[in-house]
Amino acid sequence: MIKPESSPPAEKAAASALKRGRTRAWAWWVAAGLALAVILSGYVRCFTKYGDLTPLIRFGSEFDATVVPSIRAQPHHVQNGDGFDGQFYTQLGTDPLLLKPETPVAMDNTSVRPRRIMLPVLTWLLSAGGQAWLVLWVYPLLNLAAWLALGVVTWRILRPMGNDVAVGAFLAIVLGPGAVESASRAVTDLPAFMLAFLSLGIAGYGGAVVLSLAALGRETTLLAWPGRMGELARWPTSWRRWLLDGAISVAPLAVWMVSLQLRFGSGGAGVDGGNLGLPLSGLFTRLKEIASHLSAQPVASVSDLLLHPAIQCGLLIVSVLTQLIFLLKNPQRNDALWRWGVLAGTLGLCLGWATWEAFYTVTRHLLPLHVAFNLLLVRSENRAVWFWLIIGNLHVLPRVLYWVDFH
């Protein structure tokens, strides 16, 4: 009887590759399950503790007297102080065109808040014409929908790459602090970012229409427009097309802003909403604050260390600078995401103290930089890819812990 020959090297290599492929497939499903569990955890914790999702909206006691009557009549959580921006966008969900006299009175700024009309209009449509009890549920859940969309799109982009770095980048993007910050404060950044992100993959003027909707959610998403301009070498022969594309992207926001200016004036804020300052001024001011925070608030445990404001801010600064340095060090000028990420990172250096004071607000502005860094890192041939991945995402874990422990 002839004994079967052992498998040749090629077959062994194929079997080994198949085994690694199965391992990667399981890793992807585990990563997806982990990401979904983290995303839902904050919402579940909020609901089980308060009975609804209004703590995410962050109504503040300082504005309680001016809340629109339809919202005031509904049970909702009110925190001490001035709350946060989501409270104004939620109220716009009952009257997005500000046709009722009480709506402008409820705004802290009649220029900036109504300018970002996209989510309030969507809330109004999904809440049967602005039914207040539905608005209080629909509005905070729009960030959940955008968050899940980010996960699906990122999964579809990264999974075919089939390597371990891609799994890490997937988790870093989906659980990134910009997404956490947008969801935990029920603001417009993540939904607007997702529309702008999707516009990069839509050819023709349809993509410009989608980008115009994103701009009505957050003006800075217009920084994605250069990413729609194709290869740089073709710009001179396509300038008429790109000008029309840009006009379509900008026109709805421009018309709406002019309308608000004519109706309500400047509202006490400039075009930037008070977010910008001299380059690096906000960053340097925040660096000075880190030392004083460390001395004022002692660290008692590892958890305290990760959640310590000064430590979180320090990790955030290191991560953001690492991401921007990587993109500048590895230029891909014909890549849509690279252009958007670099422009967003440059804008981030010009954010003033009004943004850096609540320092994780910065991560919402820098969502394009964060996503571009992680996606382009996976595609790069850099030998130190794991070093860049870890250092560029040091700020992810502290915000994940904050979200999971939402209170």
Task: Tell where the protein language model's regions lie, with residue ranges.
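Transmembrane-helix signature of polytopic, membrane-embedded enzymes
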Residues: 133-137, 154-175, 193-194, 335
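Membrane-lumen/periplasm interface segments of specific transmembrane helices
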Residues: 39-55, 226-232, 238-345
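Specific aromatic-rich, kink-prone transmembrane helix
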Residues: 153, 171-173, 191-207, 372
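Membrane-embedded glycan-lipid processing machinery
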Residues: 111, 115, 126, 134-145, ...
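Hydrophobic, aromatic-rich transmembrane alpha-helices
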Residues: 151, 304-334, 349, 367-379, ...
